[in-house]
Amino acid sequence: MSRISKAEMSKLLSVYFIMGSNNCTKDPLQVLREALEGGITIFQFREKGEGALTGEERICFAKELQAICKEYGVPFIVNDDVELALELDADGVHVGQDDEGITSVREKMGDKIVGVSTHTIEEARWAIENGADYLGVGPIFPTSTKKDTKAVQGTKGLAHFREQGITIPIVGIGGISIENTASVIEAGADGVSVISAISLAESSYESTKKLVEEVSRSL
């Protein structure tokens, strides 16, 4: 197995759904299924914050979600927890700046997908040099899902990454909705990552379909 190519990674980032049990008001397994039917291209398991599952329950829930992703042939990524990603033989892991260092993550994950959240050009360059396959850049817009976010960057912040010669695949993160998706892609992102735009939508299926349409229209 070799590392994923830039072109393949770029395609996978199109509509990146992130979810944990506490991000849904409906059955999360049903929400994920609808999102997959609607066309998400990659999924990240992020079980964090108030009311999040822990221990064995968390692992069992992750396995259920992973099995559904497998049915649809969509990569299953674990947020932050490298050990869980290895235990589940997940397709990859996504880490932030305060999580385990990228060098040791890459070492442990082998050729699997490694994504890194970055807020500055320096962080981006460090992540690229040490084995990141893609960057999560944001928050682009204000978000209520994550309580520990850095300052909002806007689409200008994202465009700045491209202007500074960062060519690695980038997914925009933070406060992204159907209405503002086009502006994120136009600023230079390969895709958008969303939580509530899908998890809290009246129809997760319809919402995903609209996101997919917006991304392909703007690319």
Curated annotation (Swiss-Prot):
Transmembrane intervals: none
Described function: Condenses 4-methyl-5-(beta-hydroxyethyl)thiazole monophosphate (THZ-P) and 2-methyl-4-amino-5-hydroxymethyl pyrimidine pyrophosphate (HMP-PP) to form thiamine monophosphate (TMP).
Positions bound to Mg(2+): 80, 99
Gene of this entry: thiE
NCBIfam families xrefs: thiE (TIGR00693)
Annotated 4-amino-2-methyl-5-(diphosphooxymethyl)pyrimidine binding sites: 44-48, 79, 117, 146
Reactions mediated catalytically: 2-[(2R,5Z)-2-carboxy-4-methylthiazol-5(2H)-ylidene]ethyl phosphate + 4-amino-2-methyl-5-(diphosphooxymethyl)pyrimidine + 2 H(+) = thiamine phosphate + CO2 + diphosphate; 2-(2-carboxy-4-methylthiazol-5-yl)ethyl phosphate + 4-amino-2-methyl-5-(diphosphooxymethyl)pyrimidine + 2 H(+) = thiamine phosphate + CO2 + diphosphate; 4-methyl-5-(2-phosphooxyethyl)-thiazole + 4-amino-2-methyl-5-(diphosphooxymethyl)pyrimidine + H(+) = thiamine phosphate + diphosphate
Pathway(s) per entry: Cofactor biosynthesis; thiamine diphosphate biosynthesis; thiamine phosphate from 4-amino-2-methyl-5-diphosphomethylpyrimidine and 4-methyl-5-(2-phosphoethyl)-thiazole: step 1/1
Any one cellular-component term (Gene Ontology): cytoplasm
Alphabetical list of InterPro entries matching this protein: Aldolase_TIM, ThiamineP_synth_sf, ThiamineP_synth_TenI, TMP_synthase
PANTHER family found in the cross-reference section: THIAMINE-PHOSPHATE PYROPHOSPHORYLASE, THIAMINE-PHOSPHATE SYNTHASE
Name this polypeptide is given: Thiamine-phosphate synthase
Species this protein is from: Bacillus thuringiensis (strain Al Hakam)
Coiled-coil residue windows: none
Highest taxon, organism lineage: Bacteria
Family according to the record: Belongs to the thiamine-phosphate synthase family.
UniProt binding sites for 2-[(2R,5Z)-2-carboxy-4-methylthiazol-5(2H)-ylidene]ethyl phosphate: 143-145, 175, 195-196
Essential cofactor(s): Mg(2+)
